[in-house]
Amino acid sequence: MARLLLVCLGGALGSGARYLTSAWALRAFGPDFPRGTLLVNVSGSFLLAGIMTASLQSEAVPPDLRLFLAAGVMGGFTTYSSFNYETLALVEQGRLAAAAAYLLATVLGCLAAAFAATLLVRWLAG
């Protein structure tokens, strides 16, 4: 039960952070392209890969903290379902180039961010 609470609390924090990040991106850039979800998913991929690499390479991240951060905070923060919905919305609006750009930016951006975080954490760990 305690572990479930860790995930739920982390999820609440991650969801709040996702909302704030998306709201900021909407105000900063406007509604023409889903930059908020892109920012959330790329940064979330970086953070999750960093958390997992650090926790699997050393004892620095205890298992309960990893559960709170990875399954909880990052699970609440990143949003694959929004990515799919926004891509479909762009297609339905006839904005095929924007849909393709968003799809590629998300997939490649998230992979690149995860790779960069893994390399960074391994480098920092020596």
From Swiss-Prot:
Which keywords belong to this entry? Answer: Cell inner membrane, Cell membrane, Ion channel, Ion transport, Membrane, Metal-binding, Sodium, Transmembrane, Transmembrane helix, Transport
Listed GO cellular component terms?
plasma membrane
Q: How is its activity regulated?
A: Na(+) is not transported, but it plays an essential structural role and its presence is essential for fluoride channel function.
Enumerate the InterPro entries for this protein: FluC
Job of this protein: Fluoride-specific ion channel. Important for reducing fluoride concentration in the cell, thus reducing its toxicity.
Annotated family: Belongs to the fluoride channel Fluc/FEX (TC 1.A.43) family.
The protein's name is Fluoride-specific ion channel FluC
Species per Swiss-Prot/TrEMBL record: Anaeromyxobacter dehalogenans (strain 2CP-1 / ATCC BAA-258)
- The gene from which this protein is expressed is fluC
